[in-house]
């Protein structure tokens, strides 16, 4: 992340770690960094120049950056992975979204962190017949529900029946009030 800062690439912490900063459960996997879709190449070049191995998987909404394998602290440990997302829930990331990030100290590093609402929107928009893990979402929503803009979430996810089902579930469980 220091390479992105030094090179002037706008970015923010997203995904599970951003929700953790907001009070959600601690994530157990990779770190998600969000960049504007217009800055993909600049971000990839910045991270590669800093010594990270950049890979472009078949998914068209992210690239992956792996830290130096020697940074692993355990013999069988995989190198640290950073997913660099430029689309959230199918929507291109724009600079105005990154402008909503606030700086926090996360594990000893000052970093911009996206607010919970756009992250939850992306998670709900990603629900489908192939991925529909309500249990993980329930844990997050219970922890950060007061920080979420439910009107904005409902509006942004109204075209996804899986998101609608999740919103109905959390209303019926009285995790949130009626929308």
Regions found by a protein language model. Give the residues of each.
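Compositionally biased terminal segments of proteins
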Residues: 1-179
């Amino acid at each position: 992340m220091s390479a992105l800062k030094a090179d002037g690439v706008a970015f923010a912490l997203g995904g599970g770690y951003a929700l953790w900063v907001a009070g959600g459960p601690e994530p157990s996997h990779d770190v998600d960094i969000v960049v504007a879709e217009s800055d993909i190449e600049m971000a990839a070049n910045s991270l590669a120049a800093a010594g990270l191995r950049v890979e472009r998987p078949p998914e068209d909404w992210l690239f992956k950056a792996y830290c130096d394998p020697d940074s692993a602290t355990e013999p069988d440990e995989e190198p640290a992975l950073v997913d660099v997302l430029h689309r959230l829930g199918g929507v291109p990331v724009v600079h105005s979204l990154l402008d909503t990030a606030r700086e926090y100290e996360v594990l000893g590093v000052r970093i911009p962190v996206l607010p919970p609402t756009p992250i939850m929107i992306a998670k709900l928009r990603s629900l489908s017949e192939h991925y529909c893990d309500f249990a993980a979402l329930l844990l997050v929503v219970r922890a950060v529900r007061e920080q979420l803009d439910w009107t904005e979430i409902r509006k942004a996810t109204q075209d996804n029946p899986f998101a609608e089902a999740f919103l109905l579930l959390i209303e019926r469980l009285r995790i949130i009030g009626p929308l």
